[in-house]
Regions:
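Cysteine-nucleophile active-site neighborhood
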Residues: 40-43, 47-51, 55, 366-461, ...
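Flexible phosphate-sensing "switch/lid" loops adjacent to ATP/NTP-binding sites
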Residues: 20-346, 355-372, 379-380, 386-393, ...
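Short hydrophobic targeting helices and cationic amphipathic motifs
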Residues: 6-9, 16
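Flexible, glycine/charged-enriched surface loops at secondary-structure junctions
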Residues: 295-296, 344-349, 507, 558-559
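Short beta-alpha connecting loops at secondary-structure transitions
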Residues: 80-88, 266-270, 375, 396-402, ...
């Protein structure tokens, strides 16, 4: 009885502690801003901070505030904005959320991505409902209050220890002004539970042989002018900064010397967390926020990944067939290939092949030397025929081929034209009058007129056919993958495809939508309607990409 009593007291005590942690423990907020120029890597720094705090046992999340007026980046041109990243709950977001997930392994949601457009829409909707009781709606306090609500609600709802918020753009931008005011207010209200980390640029003037700190000083001055004193400065630089430079920045910017961190150019973005840890960024954050420092985490699995990556000597060549030559347009695909290369002990050389200029006359030359071909996702007519040409060449030459979303659809169309004998086969997206619409618009999409946020988005279940190649790759029957599409494989043609050798080996159990096609007799010829690149992380590479690279390595060995 005494033992049972002691056990009961122990369990009761643990429950009380848990309740205390959940209800009383305060969420800490870290705001990451940028100055001097854009594209300094705030997303990588935010991801690295998240990784370092996570390694210390903290429950973290990272959110991105984009100051543009679009509701989301779903309809933005990839040339302007890069890749549109899709969260598990179907939100179209900035590509930085991909970095957050790949570094930390967390799953982001709609709450992790916010734009000025969504903020204003929420406020206007409230005004129309009468929530403000006839008050004049202004940037301060109504817009800033809505921003603050979105910051704090994320931490309060899910009881995170740390919420890291990256503010897009640079200090001084007109679009960022409401966000900066909201941060100023939050820092005042939350005290030591909120800090600002400001990322700036220290240029090197080659002609003079000097590093210039003046842009950083002006950037901090601009930040101070809106009422925000940075707690930590991170200096992006091409050259190593000696201590006198760091002391100068600390002195003129009112920041502790040990809170001035330099971020040199590194061979890989995945080395940034180690670099930040070596300079004590995580300990500076914890000290500023009144948290215990504890022991320095080893980051063992992360270091093992980097060691394996750096030790890889052999290479494998992968051709990306797409129409956007901006690297960021296929960011998640490139990173997924890189992860898969590391876990196959190979460096992946990626060559972009513009499908707009790919023809039957030059395809052999353009694809020469590639060990595997990935046909990229996309939308619209431009570059489509080039993707079909690539699919035909790869299929007839038995080259490992991976088609994603539109890439898979082009593999299906090519097969219909050249194997099934339907020379006019096409997608309804490209040709509404084609009699052989092997790719058709989804039934639920037919009456939708708005473009933004209306596709089949987010994670859906897929059931794999036992005995198929993809079943062997995943090693399970039921999977979940993320989607972003309006068009689908037309099931009216399924029997013809399967009789001719292209198998439909993955299906959604509710809608019967074909998710995966493969040709079993080939070395590796797989197309997916979903986007597997959204689920590949540093420590958990996606099995399809790992197996694809493995097939490409075998292809290279057999040449």
């Amino acid at each position: 009885m005494l033992t049972l009593h002691l056990v009961f007291l122990y369990v009761f005590n643990r429950i009380l502690i848990l309740i205390y942690i959940i209800t009383v423990a305060e969420t800490k907020y870290i705001f990451v801003t940028g100055g001097v120029v854009s594209s300094l890597g705030k997303g990588i720094i935010s991801s690295s901070i998240g990784k370092l705090l996570q390694a210390r046992g903290y429950n973290i999340t990272i959110q991105k505030f984009d100051p543009y007026i679009n509701i989301d980046p779903g309809t933005l041109n990839p040339y302007e904005h890069g890749e549109c990243y899709v969260t598990v709950d179907g939100m179209e977001t900035d590509l930085d959320l991909g970095h957050y997930e790949r570094f930390t392994g967390i799953q982001t949601t709609k709450a992790n991505s916010l734009t000025t457009g969504r903020i204003y829409k929420a406020v206007i909707d409230k005004e129309r409902r009468g929530d403000y009781l006839g008050k004049t709606i202004q940037v301060v306090p109504h817009i800033t209050d809505e921003i603050k609500r979105n910051v704090k609600s994320l931490g309060q709802k899910y009881h995170y220890d740390f919420v890291i918020t990256e503010i897009g753009g640079t200090i001084g931008d007109i679009e960022s002004a409401p966000f900066m005011e909201a941060i100023r207010q939050l820092k005042w209200e939350l005290g030591k539970n909120a800090i600002n980390i400001h990322l700036t640029y220290v240029p090197y003037l080659r002609a003079a042989g000097e590093l210039k700190t003046k842009p950083t000083q002006h950037s901090v001055k601009e930040l101070q002018s809106v009422g925000i004193q940075p707690d930590v400065l991170i200096l992006r630089t091409e050259k190593h900064l000696e201590e006198p430079v760091l002391k100068k920045v600390a002195n003129f910017c009112n920041v502790d010397l040990d809170c001035v961190i330099q971020s040199e150019d590194l061979p890989s973005i995945y080395e940034v967390p180690i670099n930040m840890q070596n300079q004590g960024l995580d300990t500076a954050i914890l000290r500023k926020m009144g948290e215990p420092i504890g022991e320095k985490p080893s980051l063992g699995p992360w270091r093992a990944f980097l060691e394996r990556r750096n030790n890889a000597k052999d290479t494998v060549n992968i051709g990306l067939v797409g129409k956007y030559d901006l690297q960021d347009a296929y960011k998640s695909i490139r990173e997924s290939l890189s992860h898969a290369g590391t876990y196959n002990d190979r460096k992946v050389n990626i060559t972009f092949i513009n499908s707009e200029y790919l023809t039957e006359d030059n395809v052999a030359e353009k694809l020469k030397g590639q060990d595997g071909i990935l046909i990229c996702p996309g939308f619209g007519q431009r570059g489509i025929e080039g993707k079909i040409v690539a699919a035909h060449y790869c299929r007839t030459h038995n080259i490992p081929t991976f088609g994603i979303c539109l890439g898979m659809q082009m593999m299906v169309i090519e097969f219909a034209r050249n194997v099934l004998g339907y020379a006019d086969a096409n997608s309804r997206e490209m040709d509404e009058k084609t009699p052989h619409n092997v790719i058709d618009i989804m039934e639920e999409q037919k009456n939708i007129t708005n473009m933004g946020g209306t596709m089949r988005l987010g994670a859906y279940e897929c059931v794999l056919r036992q005995g198929s190649r993809v079943f062997d790759i995943y090693k399970k029957e039921h999977i979940q993958e993320r989607h972003r599409h309006r068009y689908e494989f037309n099931n009216d043609f399924q029997k013809e495809y399967e009789r001719a050798g292209m198998q439909c080996v993955g299906r959604n159990p509710e809608s019967d939508l074909v998710e995966i096609v493969e040709i079993p007799g080939m070395k590796w010829y797989i197309g997916t309607q979903f986007h597997p690149e959204y689920q590949s992380t540093v420590l958990h590479p996606h099995p399809l990409f790992v197996n694809f690279i493995k097939a490409a390595i075998a292809q290279k060995s057999n040449k």
